[in-house]
A protein has these predicted regions:
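C-terminal and inter-domain tail/linker signature
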Residues: 1-119
Length: 119
């Protein structure tokens, strides 16, 4: 599987499986960095994805670029929270058929405020 094929499984989990990452090949020590949360292992990330995935109402990969084992995706997504649609960039690194690292980049100010207000 190419890095892009592995990453396609990851995005399919967001698009059609409500964040269920059980079939996604995340390395056990998968590292994720984002504006709202950071994770240092696959199981913690999977738990967050299941919770967040239940609130995602729209998720579209607008564009993807590959550079060796890195896949950069531009994503448009919406959540069942009182926030505007969001656009983000995500960089995923793949080694030996597993996603080892992810970095999500977007302006999370509105999302953090909605989460803090308990909406």
């Amino acid at each position: 599987m190419s890095p892009k094929d592995v990453v396609a499984l990851y995005y399919d989990a967001w698009i059609s499986k409500r964040g269920d990452m059980s079939a996604v090949p995340l390395a056990p020590d998968f590292k994720f960095r984002g504006p709202v949360a950071n994770f240092d292992d696959a199981e913690s990330y999977r738990a967050m994805a299941r919770e967040a995935g239940a609130m995602v109402t729209s998720f579209t990969v607008r564009q993807q670029f590959t550079d060796g084992n890195r896949v950069c995706s531009i994503i448009d997504w919406e959540m069942a929270l009182p926030v505007a649609p969001m656009t983000s960039a995500e960089i995923l690194e793949v080694e030996n058929g597993q996603i080892t690292r992810g970095e999500l980049i977007y302006d999370a100010q509105e999302l953090r405020a909605a989460m803090a207000a308990g909406r």
